[in-house]
Amino acid sequence: MIYPIVAYGDPVLKKVAQDIEKGSLDVVKMSADMFETMENAHGVGLAAPQVALNLRMFVIDTSVFDDEKITPVRKTFINPVIEEEWGDEWPYEEGCLSIPGVRADVYRPANLRIRYFDTDWKEHVEEFDGMTARVIQHEYDHIEGVLFVDHLSSIKKRLLKGKLTNISKGDCDASYRMKFPIKK
């Protein structure tokens, strides 16, 4: 099932998401639906709050990057906790399915260690670096109620204010179905 993607301005995007209790929902189906939604929108990651679910879960697929230095990773992260981030912060022009048409440089540490459960409720602790770490950090921010634009300087935020307001009203171009917080 392809979910509509929640647009900038929806309160669910600014909430700290809730842990998922084992057995409380079908995480295998939810993961499959989130991957289908992400792929339909040509994304590399999608967090549950972006499909209006206030839950600590996200999916990533870095195989879409055409770069031999990036090891493809396709995973579901349930109740993740970033235990440590380290390394030099580096900029990359990020975008977000909830904020179509807006991109900006965000600085993030190069490495991380994360603890999470998979869809079989097996616990993992793994380290990631480079672009995969960045995608995880971006999606993790979503379950913490943080958007990539929150990392920008106040000047850049002011410059984007009109565009962000328009997105919240549905005045944007997206090739996928979206849910807008403010009706036109």
Swiss-Prot record:
InterPro entries: Peptide_deformylase, Peptide_deformylase_sf. It comes from the Bacteria. Fe cation binds at C96, H138, H142. The keyword Metal-binding applies. GO terms for molecular function: metal ion binding; peptide deformylase activity. NCBIfam families: pept_deformyl (TIGR00079), PRK00150.1-3 (NF001159). PANTHER family: PEPTIDE DEFORMYLASE. This is Peptide deformylase.
